[in-house]
Amino acid sequence: MLCIQTSNLTKKYGSSLAVDGIDLEIKSGQVFGFLGPNGAGKSTVIKLLTTLMPPTKGELTVLGIDAAKSPLEIRRKIGVVLQQPSYEMTLSVENALDKYGMMWDVDKKTRKERTEELLTSFGLQEIRKKKNDDLSIGQRRRVQVAREFMHDMDLLFLDEPTVGLDPSARRELLDF
């Protein structure tokens, strides 16, 4: 089964062509990535594939769902870690995870269980009470990835999750 399929996916910003007619077929279970220099359109493609922005033209199907007809249905089934992260700086790590679960309507018991699982799985137990404002960039990235696992998703998109990390922090994040 294909989890992502595009046909002639194109994005223009005014007269500037950012993405030029991409055709993709990505199978379920496949790990896939984009390589290219700064400004090549990698982040734009991810925003198109995650329905965070509409294409100028072309077709997109994610998990069998037509993006033109049901972009919100797609958003409910995917996780997205963007290059420019968003944080609630005043929340502790565990409260940030819990709040994200609340946003996805995860019941309280499940949120508590998942928070504990994710704190352990992502090596966040020792910093669970720290506020996001007090975390290193690497710790913030781990929290950002962990919070996507608070809801049931079928597909995870990562847009440069290791940007700004030193080599040891990069390896640590990728090991999760």
Model-derived segments and spans:
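Helix-to-loop junction immediately C-terminal to a conserved catalytic motif
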Residues: 50
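Hydrophobic anchor residue at the start of the ABC signature
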Residues: 145
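Conserved ABC ATPase signature
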Residues: 131-135
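Catalytic Walker B motif of ABC-type/P-loop ATPase nucleotide-binding domains
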Residues: 156-159
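Conserved ABC transporter NBD signature motif
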Residues: 58-66, 73-74
